[in-house]
Amino acid sequence: MAAQRIGLTFQGGAWAAFGRTFLYAILSVCVLPAAWGVVSLLRWWADNTRLADGSRLSFVGRASRMWFLFAVLAFLELLPQCARQGVSPDRRMAVVLVATVVLLPLVALVKLHLYRWIVAQVRLEPGGGARLTASYGGYLGWLVIVTASVFTVVLWPFALTAMLRWLCGHVRGKGVSVTFTGTGLGLLGQTLLWLACSVLIVPIPWVLRSIYRWFTGHLLLWREDVEEWQEVEVAVTV
């Protein structure tokens, strides 16, 4: 049976996008409650994402299960900026860069574990769960490429979209696969538009909604056997 191509559409509101993103940012800066910000954002995203075939997405993860790892990740991502304190202005950029590079293998390890947990907590109804099979070495390699591309200013969208295609290609479920169709050029153009609108301050909630819509709209779900999905629920243990 040929695979069924299913598009995704994000229908969340602009002010809700602003509120959830702001909550996520605040809780991440506070480090310890970072998991509650992430879970709240993911649950809201899943509840507001519609699939072309009428299926429903839900996020069933609990922040209390993974709060420590989310806190560790938030701390690791803030650490390079903290390292610049007390350093002379002409050396701050170098200190941040060195700290970022040194911490990258550990950041990759924590992120990959969290990504696997997040994918396992997403449910498709009718259907079930999935798992992320991406390897640590592969993900670390992509993270190095994306991090290095940030310093080129214009190449990071191409690196980021390539990494997202690689990650989505490693999502496995019962009769289901995921692909990401966004391009680097498309993301670069959208980013310039988002930045231009954000300068005006007022459109920021709509900019955030557009960001969620763009990334969600470039996800595709492929079902190889629709009838089997209606009968089988995949149990994923992390």
Question: Model features per residue range: what roles?
Answer:
Residues 1-22, 37-72, 112-142, 161-190, ...:
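Membrane-interface extramembranous regions at the lipid-water interface
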Residues 16-38, 64-111, 141-161, 189-212:
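Hydrophobic alpha-helical transmembrane segments in multi-pass membrane proteins
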